[in-house]
Amino acid sequence: MTKLWGGRFTKTAEAWVDEFGASIGFDQQLVEEDIEGSLAHVTMLEKSGILANEEVEQIKKGLHILLEKAKKGELNYSVANEDIHLNIEKLLIDEIGPVGGKLHTGRSRNDQVATDMHLYLRKQTKEILQLVKNVQAALVEQAKQHVETLIPGYTHLQRAQPISFAHHLLAYFWMLERDYGRYEDSLKRLNVSPLGAGALAGTTFPIDREYTAELLGFDGIYENSLDAVSDRDFIVEFLSASSLLMTHLSRLCEELILWSSQEFQFVEMDDAFATGSSIMPQKKNPDMAELIRGKTGRVYGSLFSLLTVLKGLPLAYNKDMQEDKEGMFDAVKTVKGSLAIFAGMIQTMKVKEETMTKAVHQDFSNATELADYLATKGMPFREAHEVVGKLVLLCIQKGIYLLDLPLSDYKAASDLFDEDIYDVLQPKTVVARRTSAGGTGFTEVKKAIAKAEKILAN
């Protein structure tokens, strides 16, 4: 098959070479964006007096026919035509005749593909923003039900201090809020039009770049044609934001996996988000949480891959940049799928309050409260820390917990202890007293929920 760019060549490549160089197998996902960009471009060509009205109407009609076929999955692509851009141009010429070849006037595939990807990522980013909000809403709904449900807080995966389960869930709300902000902020740099930059140096045709930018809903245009066609920062930024988002999802998935184990029994995943074993009838595996944890690495890989591609490229376009798309497409699919699954898991998980409550009563996570108690009575905190450490050791030797220790043992350790110590050591009291801003105290958690709901409502 003769290439649309084949004028200066004396022979064509063999099929296996075409196969290696072609991107149509994956960039066909840009078909709607490609046609959308072409419709804006040809509209501008008429406005600028470059093409006649009758030519433009023919081209528009053909493009709309192709768009409808694309939506129905009825377009037949050819590897010989390499990519989505040449495939659409060839299909357009087949549909309306030689006038279809005028569509590419004043445009290069270099600015065309960049435009397609800007349009694609803008749409996907906006959809991801909504999915992030869905997960945040699920976290808040669970938090509202568990303000006074206590759970051990951990450091080094060792029980540290009792906290409100709602407080733990809300930690992820705020992580996701930062993720939301990163995606939202990236739109400022993403929503800029490269269309009209040509191959690298602009064009001699009297095009109107601002007009096509307006038609496509962009906020402005790239100020430098070289930058316009060689920039992939917007994809890197998307992948970076996505990597952080997936990190946050993965961390909570790790906790859900632990919490749903027999060793913890803090939560139970809904059957819809778990699987069984082909050999062990008793098993209920948290597969969806494990998959999100595992898929996080795919997104990291896409980010590192693109950074590696870009780091040594001279300006402007290089064929290496064809490698920007598969990772982008994969990351979009992974992030959207993970967010949808995650929201469902959080909405439907069963919280085992009794097990959580038992856990905070059978540990030493209230020990810090003892040290604070002594410090408020004038003992230097470092000395109080030493006293309480010895009391914990005494309890371990006796096989009891701090609430079980007789007052006589407390008095022997320090005269500052009194009978009110047993009130102070109650896990619910320990949590309620953490009233510093952003703390786990019930009043603070309720404030945090109210603030989170206000954010979701805006």
Swiss-Prot record:
Question: Kind of enzyme, top EC level?
Answer: lyase
Which InterPro entries does the record associate with it? Arg_succ_lyase_C (IPR029419), Argininosuccinate_lyase (IPR009049), Fumarase/histidase_N (IPR024083), Fumarate_lyase_CS (IPR020557), Fumarate_lyase_fam (IPR000362), Fumarate_lyase_N (IPR022761), L-Aspartase-like (IPR008948)
Query: Which reaction equation describes what this protein catalyses?
Result: 2-(N(omega)-L-arginino)succinate = fumarate + L-arginine
Q: Which GO terms describe its biological process?
A: arginine biosynthetic process via ornithine; L-arginine biosynthetic process
Pathway listed? Amino-acid biosynthesis; L-arginine biosynthesis; L-arginine from L-ornithine and carbamoyl phosphate: step 3/3
Q: Which UniProt keywords apply?
A: Amino-acid biosynthesis, Arginine biosynthesis, Cytoplasm, Lyase
* Compartment(s): Cytoplasm
- Record carries keyword Methyltransferase: no
Which cysteines does the record link by disulfide bonds?
Answer: none
Q: What is its EC number?
A: 4.3.2.1
What GO CC annotations are associated with the protein? cytosol
Checking PROSITE patterns in the record gives: FUMARATE_LYASES
| The UniProt record lists the keyword Cytoplasm | yes
Q: Name one Pfam family in it.
A: ASL_C2
Q: Supply one GO molecular-function term.
A: argininosuccinate lyase activity
Q: Which residues form the signal peptide?
A: none
Task: Give the record's family classification.
Answer: Belongs to the lyase 1 family. Argininosuccinate lyase subfamily.
Protein's name according to its UniProt entry: Argininosuccinate lyase
Question: Which species is this UniProt entry from?
Answer: Halalkalibacterium halodurans (strain ATCC BAA-125 / DSM 18197 / FERM 7344 / JCM 9153 / C-125) (Bacillus halodurans)
Q: Which gene encodes it?
A: argH
